[in-house]
Amino acid sequence: TDWKCKVLDRTSLIIEIFGARARTKEGVFQVELAALTYQRSRLVRSWTHLERQRGGLGFMGGPGETQIEADRRLINERISKLKKVLKEVRRTRALHRNARQRIPYPIIALVGYTNSGKSTLFNALTGSNVYSQDQLFATLDPTMRGLELPSGQKIILSDTVGFISELPHELIESFQATLEEVTEADILLHVHDISHPNAETQKSDVLLVLNKMGLTDDADVPILEVRNKIDCLDTEEREFQLNQSSRSEKKIILISAKDGEGLKTLLSTLDTELNTRNKVMKIKLPWTDSKTLAWIYKRGQVIKRRDGNESVDLTIKLHPSDVARLENRLNS
């Protein structure tokens, strides 16, 4: 029977969905690079199959040889061009990150399995209108917005691409520029759909990808677990989750991004996490650098101060991200 429909393997299907969701030139280029890289790996197999049909395996220089070389050359040329474009994208992103280092705001990144509700949470916290739908890979391109915590601490919240189990290698390589935004965050909020029947498996899949990126619970960047969609749980399951979160050694925040439940707790937890991670350091600052002195008083806590004739000796407490920003100011 002729069904007249496209047949795709898992990787091709994921790439096709990514292609349908891409909304920026960068996203389109990243998907195209992944598709071509995967297509190139399949060229030899497809042409070998054709040779078998034609009975051409018994001699060199079969009918498919010239065509496969031409196909490979065209694909390689396009891949080379795309890599150059995306290399420039990564360079631009690096410049933007360096610029943000001078802005005294920690970066909080939302990570999680696809369709876990990250964009809905992002919109609920920032009042933005980022595209969010009940579908796979609704977000491909990182989006950032400013947000003020209850203490008055300002942060930058970043919404990122959703993960999936056994994410194809081609996609990880192609989306390197996007994934780098995750590695530069000060805190990761791991959002997962607690109502999903495979919630624990999805959680493990995300942690595995983060681990491959060098981000673990033992790393400098803390990972806070945010269990979303508690509004979809029945009373018994909700009680179970509440008991489990209260007994856990690690901080677990239960929320409903859709209804707003638990968002105040999430924000206050971020406040606490940022404050407890502050580092103490000593610096000598010349009186001529009054702007940096004002910046320190605005961003950190001055524990001890001793004024000299030409400089001031300070013992201060700063968030790790602000320590890096202060070092950039002092070295610029």
Question: Across the structure, where does each feature detected by a protein language model lie?
Answer:
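Switch/coupling subdomain of P-loop NTPase systems
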Residues: T1-R54, G62-P63, K317
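Inter-motif core of Ras-like GTPase G domains
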Residues: L171-H196, N211-L215
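Switch I (effector-binding) loop of TRAFAC-class P-loop GTPase G-domains
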Residues: R93, R100-P106, A124-I156, I164-A177, ...
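Short, acidic/turn-prone active-site loops that include or flank metal/cofactor-
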Residues: T11-I15, L136-F137, K258-D259
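C-terminal-of-GTPase-core extension/linker across diverse P-loop GTPases
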Residues: S41-S116, F122, P197, L208-S332
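Hydrophobic residues in beta-strands of the RecA-like P-loop NTPase core, especially within AAA+ ATPase
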Residues: L157-S158, H192, R227
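Short amphipathic alpha-helical segments with heptad-repeat character
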Residues: R23, Q30, A34-T37, S41, ...
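Flexible beta-alpha connector loops of hexameric P-loop NTPases
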Residues: R21-K25, Q67, N129-Y131, V161-L171, ...
